């Protein structure tokens, strides 16, 4: 009689959340919600990209900003978050690794971590905050001699005209 033997491979997984860090402190606070549509790329320890996904709703509970790479053999991995229109919160703030931001603020990469077979490491997350860029508005004021609303050749600019900017509430 022959016995067929096989090795059971236990796969690992890595993931967590990308959230809107409204106070920019690098800590997931109560009320700070996840962000869907952020690209997360998975790399092995040699720096080879293994896959990517967009953050989405968690299938358990439905919270926004969830990602997970599953069915990974034991080994070294890291992820890189694409900040999109946001900026990264400070990295590794506080003592609780489950609620801090793990993304390097410059590169978006996490540290390299080694997963063992069967490990489910859901602690690799990123805090993002909205960028408030300074804005400007302006153009040119001219004497519209023919009153057609179009600046024609020969219609000269006017100095000393006061321009007032209002918000949507008229203030």
Where are these regions (language model features)?
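Acidic Ser/Thr-enriched surface turn/capping motif at secondary-structure junctions
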Residues: 1-171
